[in-house]
A protein has these predicted regions:
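Short structural boundary motif marking the start of a folded domain
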Residues: 2-8
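Short polar catalytic/cofactor-binding loops
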Residues: 11-15, 43-45
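Flexible, glycine-rich phosphate/dinucleotide-binding loops
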Residues: 14-16, 59, 100, 111
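Short glycine/threonine/proline-enriched tight-turn/helix- or strand-capping micro-motif at secondary-structure
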Residues: 17-27
Length: 146
């Protein structure tokens, strides 16, 4: 397996400056416990990505940063403890990373999680050839969708 990949990364944001580059030697991430490695097939561009690019999110991620919240891809590696996914599974990612323990999560309002994060904002996102994602955030793509 390749050890490096291409990724579109932000190198500077805010103060009227945005530096966005295609980097060709980014290390391929390794999935940890409960995570999978995805080969990204598609990643949408949405308002959250634009706000991140413009430095208008509450917390600016460390640079360089890979944005991209709307990810679809194929599982290419599973980390320890992952039993519900296999190499070759086609998936999409729910980008709302919730704790599952706070009052909002317990009532089903995971988008209001007290410790919530957004995939591609507080974590590396999908504007790359490969991305690591929590296995619990994946949804299976039906065969009827290409």
């Amino acid at each position: 397996m390749k050890t490096t990949m291409r990724a579109v990364r932000l190198h500077e944001v805010g103060n009227g400056k945005t530096e966005l580059r295609l980097d060709k030697d980014v290390p391929v991430p390794t999935p940890g416990v409960g995570e999978v490695l995805l080969a990204v097939r598609a990643c949408g561009l949405n308002q959250v990505d634009l706000l991140t690019r413009d430095g208008q999110t509450p917390q600016t991620p460390p640079m360089p940063h890979i944005s991209g919240t709307e990810v679809a891809g194929d599982v290419v590696e599973v980390g320890p403890g992952v039993t519900q996914w296999s190499v070759g599974d086609r998936v999409v990612l729910d980008p709302i990373l919730s704790c599952g323990e706070c009052a909002s999560c317990l009532r089903g309002a995971t988008n209001m999680c007290a410790r919530g994060r957004v995939f591609g904002v507080q974590t590396p996102g999908g504007y790359a050839e490969r991305v690591v994602a929590p296995a619990k955030q994946l949804l299976r793509l039906p065969d009827s969708l290409s």
